[in-house]
A protein has these predicted regions:
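Short, low-to-moderate order helix/coil transition modules at the start of elongated helical scaffolds
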Residues: 1-216, 223-226
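Conserved beta-strand/loop scaffold segments within soluble protein domains that form the structured core
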Residues: 123-127, 132-394, 408-440
Length: 440
């Protein structure tokens, strides 16, 4: 039996234990969905290097781990959650520790009428299903999506009514605390016609223990809706992090999504945006900063299905030490999507001769009246620029820090939420300072 097949069987056993632990709290309809998802997972199995989309990312280390479900949380974690909040950010926050919602630690700024924010478990127990956005992720295609459905316990549900403008950011904080814990959170977001909202997702670790986060987010934007979305992953170096995001945009909607990956030992981010109406404006920004033996894999698919839409994708990576990275970005333009304006760029900075990046931007175009461009760069710091700064009295390490911070700053400065931007500038600066010091 192969390692992949063996671990598939192991997860089936854990699923049977999980279902028994629910003690009938899962509705019949949801239980059926769970079992169908597990059947699909068994059929799919874990991806391997033979799968083109996983060609450069091995799951061997993940498959050697025995993950479990946390039943009880430590008091020390519950008392220290403020340490992971964004300083000076006035938000309405939902806090989850090891996948469990913490109402006593949640709340904050009040939300206007027409906005419903809750943890998913409360809806699942009441209705047995969540109706907004749950059909966006394709079924039977991705093993981790199926695992998320099979082991789903909690997550976040956001619904913004038509025409409502939410000035207060909605912040979701996921804290991983227990060793060998596996959590499978779900985010379901619906922004109705003409509504506006800002969502901040943050993932952190409270210890150095191995753990797994396998998240699935589904966002649905109505006509002329606006959503600013920020996702920051800063878990520990022993963490495994799998993230899937599926977005559906109706006509004239605007999405600005920024994904920052700073932590995790092995991280896989997959984003699929589907531009389903005319005049959609979709932006994907990304920054990944990895060092040591970290591995980060970013896959994006922007699908243009209707005319007169524009998309802008800008991902930058900084890789130090023995770290590795993958970027595979695809823009798919259907025949009906005339007058598409699409731009994609992936730029990478290697701070070590041992660091490695595999980048593959792609255009797949079936319309003849479009303006599409893409490109990728891989390089090191400009020695002429370093020499110039040193000639002005700046030390070698400081000069390298100035240049690398400027490189990362092209993404960070696009964050429109000032407290989050300031925090990331500080976090990125400290990481780069350490990475450059290790290089010396």
């Amino acid at each position: 039996m192969t390692q992949t097949a063996g671990r598939t069987a192991w997860y089936v056993e854990r699923f049977d234990e999980f279902v028994r632990s629910l003690n009938g709290s899962s509705s019949a309809r949801l239980l059926t969905q769970r079992k169908e998802a597990m059947d699909a997972f068994v059929e799919l199995g874990f991806p391997t290097a033979r799968d083109e989309e996983w060609r450069y990312t091995s799951l061997a280390t993940l498959l050697r781990q025995d993950f479990g479900v946390v039943e009880k949380l430590g008091e020390e974690v519950l008392s220290d959650v403020d340490a992971w909040r964004v300083p000076n950010l006035q938000s309405h926050v939902l806090v989850f520790i090891d996948g469990q919602y913490q109402p006593a630690l949640s709340g904050g700024a009040s939300l206007p009428e027409g906005v419903r924010v809750s943890n998913l478990a409360s809806l699942l127990h009441r209705d047995g299903e969540v109706r907004d956005g749950t059909s966006l992720a394709p079924r039977g295609k991705d093993a981790f999506v199926e695992l998320n459905t099979a082991f789903l316990r909690d997550g976040v549900h956001v619904h913004v009514d038509k025409g409502v403008r939410v000035d207060v950011p909605i912040e979701v904080l996921f804290v991983a605390a227990s060793p060998n814990a596996a959590v499978h959170p779900r985010l379901s977001v619906r922004v109705e016609d003409g509504a506006e909202a800002t969502l901040v997702e943050r993932y952190v670790s409270a210890s150095d223990h191995v753990h797994l986060t396998n998240s699935l987010a589904e966002f649905s934007l109505g006509e002329s809706a606006h959503l600013d979305h920020y996702r920051v992953q800063d878990e520990n170096r022993a963490a495994f992090h799998i993230a899937n995001l599926y977005v559906r945009e109706e006509r004239h909607s605007v999405l600005r999504s920024t994904c920052c990956t700073l932590g995790g030992g092995l991280t896989r981010n997959h984003v699929h945006t589907h531009l389903m109406g005319e005049g959609v404006d979709s932006t994907l920004n990304g920054l990944y900063l990895v060092e040591g033996q970290q591995h980060v894999d970013n896959h994006t698919l922007i699908e243009h299905a209707q005319p007169h839409c524009q998309s802008h994708e800008f991902y930058k990576g900084i890789l130090a030490d023995d770290s590795t990275g993958v970027f595979r970005g695809q823009i798919l333009v259907h025949q009906a999507a005339q007058k598409t304006d699409a731009y994609q760029a992936n730029r990478n900075l290697l701070l070590s001769d041992r660091a490695e990046i595999n980048t593959k931007p792609q255009l797949e175009i079936y319309a003849d009246d479009v303006k599409c461009s893409h490109g990728a760069t891989i390089g090191q710091l400009d020695e002429d620029a370093i020499f110039y700064l040193r000639s002005r009295g700046i030390g070698s390490a400081a000069a390298r820090q100035v240049l690398t911070r400027a490189f990362a700053g092209e993404v960070v400065e696009r964050i429109r939420l000032e407290p989050l931007r300031v925090q990331l500038e500080d976090s990125v600066g400290k990481r780069l300072e350490q990475a450059i010091a290790n290089r010396a």
